[in-house]
From Swiss-Prot:
PROSITE patterns (UniProt xref): ATPASE_ALPHA_BETA (PS00152)
Protein name: ATP synthase subunit beta
Residues holding ATP: G153, G154, A155, G156, V157, G158, K159, T160
Gene that this polypeptide is encoded by: atpD
HAMAP family: ATP_synth_beta_bact
GO MF annotation: an example: ATP binding
Subunit and interaction comment: F-type ATPases have 2 components, CF(1) - the catalytic core - and CF(0) - the membrane proton channel. CF(1) has five subunits: alpha(3), beta(3), gamma(1), delta(1), epsilon(1). CF(0) has three main subunits: a(1), b(2) and c(9-12). The alpha and beta chains form an alternating ring which encloses part of the gamma chain. CF(1) is attached to CF(0) by a central stalk formed by the gamma and epsilon chains, while a peripheral stalk is formed by the delta and b chains.
A GO cellular component annotation in the UniProt record: plasma membrane
Amino acid sequence: MTKNIGKITQIISAVVDVKFTNNGELPEILNALECYNDKHRIVLEVAQHIGDDTVRCIAMDSMEGLVRGVEVIDTGSPIRIPVGTETLGRIMNVVGEPIDGKGDIKSSNISSIYKPAPDFTNQSTERNILVTGIKVIDLLAPYTKGGKIGLFGGAGVGKTVLIMELINNVAKAHGGYTVFAGVGERTREGNDLYHEMIDSGVINLAEPEKSKVALVYGQMNEPPGARARVALSGLTIAESFRDMNEGQDVLFFVDNIFRFTQAGSEVSALLGRIPSAVGYQPTLATDMGELQERITSTKYGSITSVQAIYVPADDLTDPAPATSFAHLDATTVLSRQIAEFGIYPAVDPLDSNSQVLDPMIVGEEHYSVARQVQQVLQTYKSLQDIITILGMDELSEEDKLTVARARKIQRFLSQPFHVAEVFTGAAGKFVNLADTIAGFKGLVEGKYDDLPEAAFYMVGTIDEAIEKAQTLK
């Protein structure tokens, strides 16, 4: 079979025009093209056909040093990456090349990053709780096995720390495989995560096949093409784990879905498409749907995904985070106001929700305690204007008691994290679901009305709060 060869005719930023004149065959849309810049392989993805003999492509790597006239080869297929157990313990980029300096990834399985979502008939509808060990999440917005979970928050409120703690609590205890896709985030954070995984044994450098995680990075310094496709590369590996050996349960972490949208917006602008609301690409909902519909569980295996989603200017109505909401089973909203109180994780207990907070799924006691906690916090929120203007003395005795309990609940929703031990000096806590429910049930029923507020701050179980109260006396 003769190779289809073209030549670069124009380079503008990350957009490259390639002319094919030899036999008039144009590469298909989404095909991967290859060219070489000083022996360095650069992959281009076909985005548009311009006229009869030219394609417009998006580069997956830096274009520095590339010139017009360079030969480009059509691979005849979309971007293909290695998948399967050979990827465990390794870091790769969007096109499947290793970036950890440990040699090639020798996998017999190569897969396209574009795949259809599983058929409706093959999808699973089971609902089981995934216990995270984080009180505020397990009580008020529980996660599901095989569900899609979104962590929403503005800049600097703790999305990445929360995702790292979930990796620590869930992935380490989880028997199956984990895939982490770093989409347009800080390289330093990706490096920290890699070394933490080595220290904790999730990545085994001596015997990589015993590792439990595969990492795919397309960080902030990458061109928009790479950032727009790296989530698909990570998802392709997660799908391969899900479908192997008659089904596996896979964890898929993405940090950050907003950067996927942002990169799509940059690519759209570079291709000259007319922007839609707030400057986003006109295909925003389609792009998000193509990614999210593939993150699903089948009758054989499951993908549980946890996605950090940056909220620009703390505005949840911005089109990027708003488009994500429709696809999620549970949303954990991180609030700047709660972070300002020094309560971490800064999860908003009234804004966060989950489809599985249902008495038929979580049980009557869990549901009842969660709703009582939210009721107390909502009452406190509605009384805050009166407290600010007139002071606590103007409240009725009943309202004073509600406020006192709400403040204790607020503090008890905080928790020291394992991954933050180096910053806080406090040992991390994993709290079982039964202990979480029992602790909050006692609080709303008034069992601990005599304990000081400070006793509930940054502790694990209610027993630790009682012990702390003894030391405060």
